[in-house]
Design a protein with these regions (language model features):
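N-terminal leader/linker segments that precede catalytic domains of diphosphate-processing enzymes
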Residues: 1-82, 90-107, 111-154
Length: 158
């Protein structure tokens, strides 16, 4: 039985196992080759290491630095209504991290592509966390983006 067929059966039995229509790469380790792909909504269910990008939006008006902070949608399954980076998203298997930063910047804050490309990688945060009956294993790659002081982020997705 193919993994997608198995997931469809599991979804009928467990409503928390969502389908997000975004493929994550399944690897033996972070630098390993892709063994298979799985829907992002199933990654935690199987304890699969997944990655994402988080971007700090910073303005500097020569007097003091300020950082934009987002509030997560109340409809999100994870951490609804909580504070978050200005831009954050899971890492699909079919694009690079930099391409994902540009995509997420546009979707979550209406940041133009040329401005988003100026983002600078700063490091990563990794964690493992039990969430109910699942294991959330994450590596979040952190970026900084200096924005014009006049810039106001506007969500461009749902």
């Amino acid at each position: 039985m193919a993994i997608e067929e198995m997931l469809e059966i599991l979804r009928t039995e467990d409503p928390k196992l969502s389908k997000l229509n975004e493929k994550y790469a399944v690897k033996e380790n972070i630098n390993g080759k892709t063994l298979m792909e799985i829907d992002r909504g199933a990654a935690d269910f199987f304890g699969i290491l997944n990655t994402g990008v988080h971007l700090n939006g910073i303005t500097n008006d020569h007097e003091n630095k300020k950082m934009w902070v987002a509030t997560r949608s109340h409809q999100r399954k994870t951490f609804p209504g909580e504070l978050d980076n200005m831009v954050a998203g899971g890492q699909p298997s079919n694009i690079t991290r930099q391409e994902n930063v540009v995509k997420e910047c546009f979707e979550e804050a209406s940041i133009p592509e040329e401005l988003a490309k100026a983002s600078e990688p700063r490091g990563f945060v990794s964690y493992n966390m039990q969430a109910g009956t699942t294991l959330r294993r994450k590596i979040l790659y952190v970026y900084d983006l200096y924005l014009p002081s006049s810039f106001i982020p506007v969500p461009n997705d749902n």
